[in-house]
């Protein structure tokens, strides 16, 4: 029940040579800590990219409004649809984040 070999057994592949055991344990431990961190970075990058796209389109619609009102209105409609898409993507990203985090831990 409290055997360290059983608890740390998943850090080593079967048949690992004895001199490589300390190095592989360190590498696998670092890998276990990096996975959730990389998952958070990916989630942040995906959400930031969506927000930047919405900001760019909103700025374009604002600039186009005095010159071409019809194009600005069409751009605003596209902006609204992209906002709905961004909300859906955020929900999917949250689901994937929680699912993968629970698998990693």
Swiss-Prot record:
Residue ranges of the TM segments: 14-34, 47-67, 72-92
CDD domains xref list: ATP-synt_Fo_a_6
Cellular compartments per GO CC: mitochondrial inner membrane; proton-transporting ATP synthase complex
InterPro entries to which the protein is assigned, alphabetical: ATP_synth_F0_asu (IPR000568), ATP_synth_F0_asu_AS (IPR023011), ATP_synth_F0_asu_bact/mt (IPR045083), F0_ATP_A_sf (IPR035908)
Localization per Swiss-Prot or TrEMBL: Mitochondrion inner membrane
GO BP: proton motive force-driven ATP synthesis; proton transmembrane transport
Membrane topology (UniProt): Multi-pass membrane protein
Disulfide bridges in this chain: none
Keywords for the protein's UniProt record, in alphabetical order: ATP synthesis, CF(0), Hydrogen ion transport, Ion transport, Membrane, Mitochondrion, Mitochondrion inner membrane, Transmembrane, Transmembrane helix, Transport
Main location class: mitochondrion
Similarity comment: Belongs to the ATPase A chain family.
Annotated function: Subunit a, of the mitochondrial membrane ATP synthase complex (F(1)F(0) ATP synthase or Complex V) that produces ATP from ADP in the presence of a proton gradient across the membrane which is generated by electron transport complexes of the respiratory chain. ATP synthase complex consist of a soluble F(1) head domain - the catalytic core - and a membrane F(1) domain - the membrane proton channel. These two domains are linked by a central stalk rotating inside the F(1) region and a stationary peripheral stalk.
Protein known as: ATP synthase F(0) complex subunit a
Lineage: Eukaryota, Metazoa, Chordata, Craniata, Vertebrata
Gene for this chain: mt-atp6
